[in-house]
């Protein structure tokens, strides 16, 4: 069954709702320039509330040093999503089995080879303005090709309850990742959309 990652969680209520509805991964953003940025205090609150629930906690970082990433793992995050221009050496230092490496897709197939031992790769839509949360899709042929090559892929970028089923059928990813596609406003999830997104993904 295809896994669901709900990203851009900023508050306790959203985190618990997503986990109880069947999300497999909850993503919390530590990048201060993101409109979905979550402070350390709030992060710790979310992690504590999710203890004992069958959901993996993912910290999303953009070009942060190893020391900060280690702090996040010590806080209780299961996985680190490297969403910037991080190199493989940082990935190895963190432990590739704990890393989801993001590739922001333009027109060509990204070179993912050296990250093949990572927990997974996540394909998102390239934008000059933002690291993720763009609400725009990219050419799914690229994602499909990487899946066919045997990579463990999270499909992201512009997914919502209306198109997620089509994306899954075409790409056949390991998982799907959504943020803005299930929001009522930046940083606040729309519970109806979350429920519908998970339902349509899990019906595959």
UniProtKB/Swiss-Prot annotation:
One of its GO terms (molecular function) is phosphoribosylanthranilate isomerase activity. GO terms for biological process: L-tryptophan biosynthetic process. Its EC number is 5.3.1.24. Pathway: Amino-acid biosynthesis; L-tryptophan biosynthesis; L-tryptophan from chorismate: step 3/5. It comes from the Bacteria. It is an enzyme of class 5 (isomerase). The keyword Isomerase applies. Keywords: Amino-acid biosynthesis, Aromatic amino acid biosynthesis, Isomerase, Tryptophan biosynthesis. It catalyses: N-(5-phospho-beta-D-ribosyl)anthranilate = 1-(2-carboxyphenylamino)-1-deoxy-D-ribulose 5-phosphate. CDD domains: PRAI (cd00405). InterPro entries: Aldolase_TIM, PRAI_dom, RibuloseP-bd_barrel, TrpF_fam. Belongs to the TrpF family. This is N-(5'-phosphoribosyl)anthranilate isomerase. It comes from Aquifex aeolicus (strain VF5).
């Amino acid at each position: 069954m295809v896994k669901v990652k709900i990203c851009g969680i900023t508050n306790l209520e959203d985190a618990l709702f997503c986990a109880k509805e069947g999300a497999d991964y909850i993503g919390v953003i530590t990048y201060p320039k993101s409109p979905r940025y979550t402070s350390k205090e709030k992060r710790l609150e979310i992690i504590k509330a999710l203890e004992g629930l069958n959901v993996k906690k993912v910290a999303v970082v953009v070009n942060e040093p190893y020391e900060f990433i280690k702090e996040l793992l010590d806080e209780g995050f299961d996985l680190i999503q490297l969403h910037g221009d991080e190199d493989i050496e940082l990935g190895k230092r963190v432990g590739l089995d704990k890393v989801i490496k993001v590739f922001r897709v333009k027109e060509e197939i990204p070179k993912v080879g050296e990250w093949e031992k990572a927990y997974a790769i996540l394909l998102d839509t390239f934008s000059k303005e933002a690291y993720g949360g763009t609400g725009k899709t990219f050419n799914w042929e690229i994602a499909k090709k990487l899946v066919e090559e045997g990579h463990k892929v999270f499909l992201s970028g512009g997914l919502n309850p209306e198109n997620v089923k089509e994306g899954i059928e075409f790409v056949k990813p390991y998982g799907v990742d959504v943020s803005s596609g299930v929001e009522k406003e930046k940083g606040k999830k729309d519970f109806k959309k979350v429920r519908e997104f998970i339902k349509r993904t899990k019906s595959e």
